[in-house]
Amino acid sequence: TGSGKYNILHNDNHNLDLTGKFLECSRSNPNLSDYNKYSAILDYLYKDKLSASLGVAHSGLLDRTDLSALGKVNLLNDKNTRLDLFGGLTKSMSPKFDSGLKPNFGLQLESSF
């Protein structure tokens, strides 16, 4: 198992990170096969207000690849509450299955007391 994060760009207004992960799964049961999982995510953040990410993950267990493109905009941010609007598309593919593009959107509210 391993992971890494590399900051490509960082200044007062912009932040761009690339994250990669690798997971090797070895099974103790000889009837189950071992498999690997890989993933990478590119994250962009503008002034802690607007963010976007592109992701890809592949699992050898099901020979499945997942793709995602997501965005988020902050609508409210005070010392106790944060409200974000998010939206994006996801897609899962394997040799026997393709989910097509699936939209994903909503509001996210975080509050601390």
From Swiss-Prot:
It comes from the Eukaryota. Coiled coil: none annotated. InterPro entries: Attacin_C (IPR005521). Belongs to the attacin/sarcotoxin-2 family. One of its GO terms (biological process) is innate immune response. Pfam families: Attacin_C. GO terms for cellular component: extracellular region. It comes from Lonomia obliqua. This is Defense protein 2. Has antibacterial activity against both Gram-positive and Gram-negative bacteria. Keywords: Antibiotic, Antimicrobial, Immunity, Innate immunity, Secreted.
